[in-house]
From Swiss-Prot:
It comes from the Bacteria. It is found in: Membrane. Is processed by three successive proteolytic events. First, the extracellular region of RsiW is cleaved by PrsW (Site-1 cleavage) in response to cell envelope stresses. Next, it undergoes cleavage at an intramembrane site (Site-2 cleavage) mediated by RasP. This cleavage uncovers a cryptic proteolytic tag with conserved alanine residues in the transmembrane segment, that is recognized mainly by the ClpXP protease, which completely degrades the protein in the cytoplasm and leads to the induction of the sigma-W-controlled genes. This is Anti-sigma-W factor RsiW. Its main location: membrane. The keyword Membrane applies. Residues 1-87 are cytoplasmic. One of its GO terms (molecular function) is metal ion binding. It comes from Shouchella clausii (strain KSM-K16) (Alkalihalobacillus clausii).
Amino acid sequence: MKTCHSHDELIHIYLDGDATKEQKEELYAHLQSCPSCREHLQELKKSIAFIQSSSHIEAPEGFTAGVMAKLPKTKKTAKWKLKAKRHPILVAAAIFLIMMSAAFFSAWSHTTDGIAVSGNGPFVIDKEAGVVVVPEGEVIDGDLVVRNGTLVLEGEVRGNVLLINSRFNKDTLYASPNQVTGEIEEVDKALSWAWYNMKEFFNEVVAVFDAGEDDPHSTDN
């Protein structure tokens, strides 16, 4: 996005909370007549809110120390420090993506420990056979999640079905989609698991932003 070069640094000072009263007034006046800077500032605000909303995601224990230990020792220069200082949001976003990816891959390793099911309704688990059965005539209200097993769906699921490292029983494979009111998604690889979690996370963030934009009391300075 093309912005006015003369006000680009002022925008970053404003977002860092270091702008003086005069600088704020100058920026507000400029935003009234410059749509590109106004849109750029709005995108930066959304990026900051996105990063702050992800504070609950943690990297695996020892991850940071391990990464730092493997980094090659290089001579520090003022050039990269200047770039990092001028683009703190890009640096923070890169660190966030690394930590989030590590957390998702770590979570995937725990999904292969044994058969597990979550859902609101009657179902039968045969751990020895690795089978989950929703009996005929029974209804699962809401989403059904099956990990490391085979799903035999004879009843109905009023929601989504997520199969993590799992599959449908071959006898019910073609009939089952007609018994699910929501979506059916299969995740059988670590990358698919990471993508699924990232997609769900981004959907939640977008929903928060949409709710904020629909709020008539929310205004930008």
